[in-house]
Amino acid sequence: EWLHNKMEFDFDNFSNLSKENRETLKKRFYLPKLEYKEHQISVEDDTEKFLFELQDNRLIESVLIGHKNRYTLCVSSQIGCLLGCDFCATALMNYERNLEVSEILLQYYYVEKYLREKNETLSNVVFMGMGEPFLNYDNVIESINMLNSKSGLNVSKRNFTISTSGIVPAIKKFTEEEHQINLAVSLHSVKDNVRSQLMPINKKYPLTELKSALVNYQIKTKNRITFEYILIDELNCEKKDAFDLAAFL
């Protein structure tokens, strides 16, 4: 009631419990918290950025995207990132660690609570913030399971999307476990030399391996895949690139 539905993280505010019970909770349990450090609102593209400070003083960012009375939350899964993608701002940060399940959940809870105060609610969640979600696989999946739980907020798994740079072993595991969670792939080129330049992870998991894993995913789950493709002048946006992309898909 208090944690998941009312999103209250101070035992003292659990008003339907006796003072004695609240004191017992405080002695036996610890509730992690985030601290708002910054909140930026952009009227131009209807986005809001939330900068949170964790218990160890590290910072993470979540982005709220509004569109036609629907709200999508872009959450982080790691502090920094190991992959060094050429077009990503997180690549400029040092990788520090994976986020805990609680730290992923709190991004959702804090922003959902913020929206409820305006009589709004989150529609979708995308793991497209800081970090590679499939390099924090267990915690990402567990956080989704908890939000999906009937004991939690009972959010449909279809409302979640995990975006990956192409971690092939994790895609295979994701396929075998048959999650009803949407999958997105950061692609940006279907030429190995170009994609490796943009995304060094392609050297470890080249396009042939990635495509094989994705084809198997579609065959087994019957789910659609979203492909992300940033147009970069003189690199991946010629007419031939479009035809090559169509052939790959």
Language-model regions: role of each:
Residues 42, 76-77, 163, 186:
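Short linear Ser/Thr-Pro motifs
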Residues 1-71:
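Flexible, acidic/Gly-rich N-terminal and inter-domain linker regions that tether
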Residues 51-53, 63, 76, 126, ...:
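Residues in well-ordered beta-strands of folded domains
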Residues 66-112:
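Canonical Radical SAM [4Fe-4S] cluster-binding loop centered on the CxxxCxxC motif
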